[in-house]
Amino acid sequence: MARAKNGTVHVARRKRILKKTKGFWGTKKSNYKKAKDTLRKGMMYATRDRKARKRDFRRLWISRISAALSDTGISYSRFIEGLLKSNIKINRKILSNLAIEDAEAFKKIVLEIRR
């Protein structure tokens, strides 16, 4: 009886890794050992940066809102407190877009909070 060495699975696994590293530079796309390590590291970065992207966007929205509020003479923390007290339920992303694209609507929200 012939010895079964699981060759098809071995080849398929290597092909799968090398297929995922298609656009990489140098031997990281063709050498299995380097490709495997680079892919693992890339997946770690991807996971980390998906989490970081959420924090980065929230920070950006807060900066934009704060910059738009500098003209009105109200601080960001007072603005958010006023939103909660006025029961205005608009998230930071929408407020940021309003501050950039529709300044009049944003100023109306600020006036509503000051009342």
UniProtKB/Swiss-Prot annotation:
It comes from the Bacteria. GO terms for biological process: ribosomal large subunit assembly; translation. The gene is rplT. GO terms for molecular function: rRNA binding; structural constituent of ribosome. One of its GO terms (cellular component) is ribosome. InterPro entries: Ribosomal_bL20 (IPR005813), RIBOSOMAL_L20_CS (IPR049946), Ribosomal_protein_bL20_C (IPR035566). NCBIfam families: rplT_bact. It comes from Borrelia garinii subsp. bavariensis (strain ATCC BAA-2496 / DSM 23469 / PBi) (Borreliella bavariensis). This is Large ribosomal subunit protein bL20. Pfam families: Ribosomal_L20 (PF00453).
